[in-house]
């Protein structure tokens, strides 16, 4: 056993929070088995790259990262490089062929075997490929929190059964399977006891939670149960599917003080024909009605959405309609992606692919529109008072920065603020907004 005691393991986790949670579970297992966890992967003996395989740019980032560490291995600075996560799951055969320097390629279903895999490659130097069935939930057991100490993600389900035609996630992650409510609550309690004050609830589709094991969506009940845990100040839910946003869910968000008035609802498009070809539902009218209802039920709600431009068959007219919709709705937060044709998805085989430069240009146009909207919403926030959680001190700008309820960690903007007193990371303070800067706000502690 002593042979491995001194083995230092570094983890680089790419992509979304759901992937990060997987990484945190692996780190916990490694530490429990006596491996040393180091925060700077370049200083480790074994590097695990927990990859994202979602769209082209994410795959490129993953491959670049792997190659970067393979170079360190060739220089003799590290002993082994392991790929885990979505890309490893998705391109299991190609990966080992294309990047022979990899010591192990580990699929999503084999994350639980990570300690054995490391021992194996260090002992007999044979490359390992390991894939397990994706039916189990790998989320029980402990984690090592890798985010800022005051917030953490909690994954309530694995996989997805929406089968949108552009998306490879169901084939990578398997079909939707919910965790038992008592397991989630137990993990959340543990997070609260460890100083987490902001809990971020994630899954590929949080609104589907419980359908597979309880026969109906249990997200409202789950959120209510999480609100009863002492220690949490803000509870945030990401990745809500528009058709599953029920009155019951909206009422719970409106009623519970701890639930932040923030809804992340990717709609992808507003055109009926395109949504249908995406294997999604609704149209401009139903979406407009839903958003109106959300804003009535939850006054001052922050709405975040995601759009795809240049989906196969998107005409100029349909794109212009999307622009009009964006202008009309005025989402508080918006991300837009140029469509990326993914291997093995139905949309990749659709005849009428839109040229890449048009897809990208359309995304730029939407983001330019959104910039104007953000500016005017920020303008409206001037002189208001907001509660901000401090995330740190920016030496360059010589001020503190943090987020309000309206900003999700890692994806939304920041609030920079001056303060005469020292403010601790994770402390919640009242800030008066004095100025704006692109997507960020500037203020002073009251």
Residue map of PLM features:
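Proteins enriched for Cys/Gly/acidic motifs involved in redox and nucleic-acid/cofactor modification
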Residues: 4-209, 248, 259, 263, ...
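Conserved SAM/AdoMet-binding glycine-rich loop
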Residues: 80-85, 90, 193-317
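Short, hinge-like loop/turn segments at secondary-structure boundaries
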Residues: 99-100, 121-124, 217-219, 253-255, ...
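Conserved, mostly hydrophobic/aromatic
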Residues: 184, 201, 237, 265, ...
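Active-site proximal loops enriched in glycine and acidic residues that flank catalytic Cys/His/Asp
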Residues: 203, 239, 267-269, 305-309, ...
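Contiguous mid-protein beta-loop-alpha structural module that forms a pocket-lining wall or clamp
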Residues: 314, 321, 329-331
